[in-house]
Design a protein with these regions (language model features):
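TM-lumen/periplasm interface segments of multi-pass membrane proteins
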Residues: 2-211, 216
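C-terminal multi-pass transmembrane helix bundles with aromatic-rich, positive-inside signatures
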Residues: 22-57, 61, 66, 469-588
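Transmembrane-helix signature of polytopic, membrane-embedded enzymes
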Residues: 209-229, 262, 431-432
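Membrane-interface alpha helices of multi-pass inner-membrane proteins
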Residues: 231-235, 251-252, 261-287, 440-447
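Specific aromatic-rich, kink-prone transmembrane helix
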Residues: 244-260, 293
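Perimembrane helix-loop-helix junctions
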Residues: 280-345
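Membrane-lumen/periplasm interface segments of specific transmembrane helices
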Residues: 318, 332-414
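Aromatic/glycine/proline-enriched transmembrane-helix motif characteristic
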Residues: 378-447, 527-588
Length: 588
C-alpha cells in the first residue's frame, strides 16, 4: 500500500446516510514514507564507518534487505556495543577496588602509593562511601558529622549531592548490605557498594542509548557513537551522572512523542539528580515561542470556562473536560512548553520538599557547597590562573567564604550566552532543531561555569551526537576529552611522586575547551545554513521536535524587527529574482 484512501462506510441497508470513514490501509501509515533504499546505511555513506566495517566483512551489499533481520536489530546491536564499552569502563575502575591485607588479619582497599592515580582508576563512588557516612548505614541528609577545616576550625557537614542522587547512593548501600547478609561471594562492603552503583549506572546509560536512538529518527546508527564513546570507558562510573543523562534523554524523547507532561516529569526528576536536565527547558520555551502563532483559542473548542461556573454541576463538567482541555492546550507549542515547565517544576518540588521539610540543613548542603566552592581545576578560570599566576576575581579567601565575584561573573557569562543562543534561535532563517540548541546551552553552561567535573562531559555526548552527526569530528572531540583524564590523574599524584606539573593538565583542558567551541561553531553554522544539516536531508524537519516537528514557521509580526527570522539564502535569491512580489518563506 503506497497511499491511504478514505471510503464511505455503507449501512446494512446499502445506503450511505453519514460520513463514517474507515482506512483502506491496514493501519495509519507512518509519517516517514521513504523507500527502503533511503534508509541510513553508515557503511555506505560514511567513510569512517566504511573503513571500520572491513573488520566484519565490509560495507552492506547493494542488494541487502535492510531492516529485515529478526534478532540483530539496530537497537540490539547498539545495546551490545554499549554493554561491551560499559564492561571496558568497569575494567578501568577495577584496579581501585582491589583488596589487600591490612596487617591485622583483615582486608582493606589497596590505594597505597597513589594507586588510584597511577592506575587512573579513580572513582568518586569509592571515597564517598565513607566520606558521606554511607558505611554507617545512616540516612542521607539526616546524618551529619563534624569535619576539621584547613584553618584549624570545624564545620558541620551533610550529604552534598542533590536529593535523587543522594537517595540513589543510599539505596545502593542498602542493596549492598542485603548482599552481604546472603550466602553469596563476599567482599569489602565498599567493593559491593561500588558494583551495585555501577550496575545501576550501566542501566542508566543503556536507557540513554535507547532514548537517543529513538530521538535520532531515521539516523538510528548515529546513537552508536553514544554507545562506543571513549568517554564511556573513562567516566561512566566516575560519578553518578549516567542517572541524569537517562532522565534527560527520556525527557527529550517524551517531548518528541508529543507528551509534554511526561517530558516535564522526567526532566524534573533529572533536575533532582543533577541540575542540567532543567536547562533543557530553555530551548523548548524559545523554539515554542518562535513556532506559536499567538492566536487565541476559540472558546467553543475550549469547553466550559471558569467564569461560567455557577453550580456544582458546572464544577463537575469543568473537571470532566479538564483532560480534553489539557490535550487541546498541548497542541499549541507554547501550551506544550508551559505544561512541560509546570510538570518539571512540580516534580522537582515533590521530590525535594519532603527532604527539605524534614532535614533543611542537609537539603541545603548541596547549594551551600556549590556557593562556597572555588574554581574547579579544569574550569576556564583556573586555567587562566595556572598560566598567569592570577589570584582570581576574589583573591585569596578563607575556608567557607564564597567567591562572590566569581559566582556573579560565571552566572552573567552564562546568561549572556543564553541570550545569544535565544537570539540565534529566533532569527535563524529556519527554526533550529531542538537538540542543536540543547547542546549549545549545556556547552555554554560548562564553559562558563566555575566547575567542570570530568564526568560532566557525559552530558554532552548524547546531545552532540543528535545535534551534529559527523562521526569523525565527534570521535576526535570525545578522544581529546577522554585523554584529559591522563594528565589530570598524574597532576593529582603530585610532582614529588613523579606526577606532572599543573600546566600539563590545564594545557589539555584548553584543547578540550577549544574542541567543544569548535562543535558549537559548526552547529551555529548549520543553524544559519540548514541546507548543510545532515539530519534535515530527505525532507526531515526535527525528529526530536515534538509539536515543533513540521510545524509552520511564521514570520512573528508581534516580535521586534531585530528578533524576527532572517531570510535564508534561498529566500534572498528568490526575492532578488522577484523584487515586486512578496516571497512566501514557507513555500520556498
Amino acid at each position: 500500500v503506497t497511499d491511504q484512501h478514505l471510503a464511505d462506510q455503507p449501512t446494512s441497508s446499502g445506503t450511505r446516510p453519514g460520513r463514517a470513514l474507515e482506512y483502506v490501509a491496514p493501519a495509519q501509515l507512518a509519517p516517514d514514507l521513504r523507500s527502503i533504499d533511503a534508509r541510513d546505511r553508515p557503511s555506505r555513506n560514511d567513510s569512517l564507518t566504511a573503513q571500520l566495517s572491513t573488520v566484519v566483512g565490509g560495507p552492506v551489499g547493494d542488494h541487502a534487505l535492510i531492516g529485515r533481520v529478526r534478532f540483530w536489530t539496530p537497537l540490539r546491536v547498539l545495546f551490545a556495543f554499549t554493554v561491551i564499552f560499559l564492561a571496558l569502563g568497569w575494567s578501568t575502575k577495577a584496579a581501585c577496588i582491589q583488596q589487600t591485607d591490612d596487617g591485622a588479619g583483615g582486608l582493606t582497599l589497596d590505594w597505597t602509593n597513589g594507586r588510584q592515580y597511577v592506575a587512573m582508576c579513580y572513582s568518586d563512588t569509592v571515597p564517598l562511601y565513607g566520606a558521606e557516612r554511607l558505611n554507617e548505614g545512616a540516612f542521607p541528609y539526616k546524618k551529619y558529622w563534624i569535619e576539621s577545616t584547613p584553618d584549624g576550625g570545624t564545620e558541620v557537614r551533610h550529604m552534598e549531592y542533590p536529593v535523587l542522587s543522594g537517595l540513589y547512593q543510599y539505596a545502593a548501600m542498602q542493596v549492598g548490605n542485603v548482599w552481604d547478609h546472603l550466602p553469596l561471594p563476599g567482599a569489602l562492603s565498599v567493593v559491593v557498594y561500588f558494583n551495585v552503583v555501577a550496575l545501576g549506572l550501566a542501566v542508566g546509560w543503556l536507557i540513554t542509548v535507547w532514548a537517543s536512538s529513538r530521538l535520532a529518527g531515521r539516523r538510528v546508527w548515529d546513537a552508536a557513537l553514544i554507545a562506543v564513546s571513549p568517554l564511556v570507558i573513562v567516566h561512566a562510573f566516575t560519578n553518578f551522572d549516567a542517572l541524569a543523562t537517562a532522565f534527560a534523554a527520556t525527557g527529550l524523547l517524551a517531548w518528541a512523542r508529543r507528551k509534554p507532561v511526561l517530558a516535564g516529569v522526567l526532566l524534573g526528576l533529572g533536575g533532582a539528580a543533577k541540575l542540567y536536565p532543567l536547562l533543557l527547558l530553555g530551548p523548548i520555551i524559545v523554539l515554542c515561542l518562535r513556532a506559536d502563532p499567538m492566536r487565541r483559542q476559540p472558546a467553543a473548542r475550549a469547553g466550559l470556562r471558569l467564569r461560567d461556573i455557577d453550580s456544582l454541576d458546572a464544577v463537575r463538567t469543568y473537571l470532566r473536560e479538564t483532560p480534553a482541555r489539557t490535550h487541546l492546550f498541548a497542541l499549541r507549542p507554547l501550551g506544550a512548553a508551559t505544561l512541560a515547565v509546570l510538570a518539571a517544576a512540580g516534580t522537582w518540588v515533590v521530590v525535594n520538599l519532603p527532604i527539605a521539610a524534614l532535614y533543611p540543613q542537609g537539603w541545603r548542603e548541596f547549594f551551600r557547597l556549590n556557593t562556597t566552592r572555588h574554581a574547579d581545576p579544569d574550569s576556564i578560570y583556573n586555567v587562566i590562573a595556572s598560566f598567569t599566576g592570577w589570584q582570581g576575581f576574589d583573591g585569596p579567601l578563607a575556608h567557607g567564604e564564597p567567591p562572590t565575584i566569581l559566582n556573579t561573573v560565571s552566572l552573567l557569562l552564562f546568561l549572556l550566552a543564553c541570550l545569544g543562543i535565544g537570539y540565534l534561535a529566533l532569527t535563524a532563517p529556519r527554526r533550529p532543531r531542538l537538540t542543536q540548541l540543547c547542546f549549545l546551552v549545556i556547552a555554554a553552561f560548562l564553559l562558563t561555569n566555575k566547575v567542570w567535573s570530568p564526568q560532566y562531559s557525559l552530558w554532552l555526548v548524547p546531545l552532540a551526537v543528535l545535534a551534529l552527526p559527523h562521526r569523525r569530528i565527534l570521535l576526535a572531540w570525545m578522544t581529546i576529552d577522554a585523554l584529559v583524564w591522563v594528565p589530570r590523574m598524574f597532576y593529582y599524584l603530585g610532582e614529588d611522586n613523579k606526577g606532572v606539573p599543573e600546566q600539563w593538565f590545564t594545557g589539555t583542558v584548553v584543547l578540550r575547551d577549544l574542541a567543544v567551541l569548535g562543535l558549537c561553531a559548526m552547529i551555529v553554522y548549520q543553524i544559519l545554513r540548514p541546507e548543510h544539516d545532515l539530519v534535515r536531508r530527505d525532507f526531515v524537519d526535527d525528529p526530536a521536535g515534538g509539536v515543533l516537528n513540521r510545524a509552520p514557521d511564521p514570520l512573528l509580526p508581534w516580535l521586534p524587527e531585530f528578533l524576527r527570522p532572517r531570510l535564508s539564502r534561498a529566500d534572498a535569491f528568490a526575492r532578488r529574482r522577484t523584487p515586486d512580489r512578496k516571497v512566501d518563506r514557507e513555500s520556498v
